[in-house]
Amino acid sequence: PGTNEYTITVTANGTGGSVSNLSKKITVLRLFDIPSAIMTGLTGGSSKVWIADKDTWGHLGVGPGPNQGAGETFYPSWYGATASGRTPAEYDDELTFTKTGPNSISLVLDNKGQTFIIPDYSGYYGLPGAMNTFNTTGTKALAFTDATSNTTSAISTRIQFTVPGHGLLSWGVGSNTYEILEITSTTLSVRSIGADGNAWYQKFKVK
């Protein structure tokens, strides 16, 4: 995805054997093609509401990032939240993914006025750690690309998306880019690299 620049040359043959050339540079925007499995999984072809999959181990978790020690484990090997193991206020967020065009998806996050910010990432959001008033209103147009991680198709869809600004999915983990590890019609598992290089994992389910 991105822009590509091309030079187009038109040659005109005139009377008497005269030839004239005209060249012009044009810029073409190439959009990333969102795979149908991702589009359908996130939006159902129209719109879907997602919530934290709080009954599943590791619905919030952390492990080593790509530049740490022995490398990534690609699962929350350092910490994984147990079923309903976080505070109740962390489980009331609703994420609405909507198909806004043949190749575009938007996100609206209703955090009920508060978001849990991981303490190490307070500077990223300009807020202290723990529960904070955080404005997530507005519709965010998501930008999809191929994943930049070293994951394989065995453990990831190899697709990631970015939420504009300091956008997030429920917990504030110091990143606005999320790799979709797994998606079904009812479950979603994502991974992101926090501001300090840790790999964070989150799991959601359809409401």
Label each region the model flagged.
Residues 19-28, 201-204:
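Edge beta-strands of extracellular beta-sandwich domains
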Residues 80-183:
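Contiguous, well-ordered beta-strand patches that form the walls/edges
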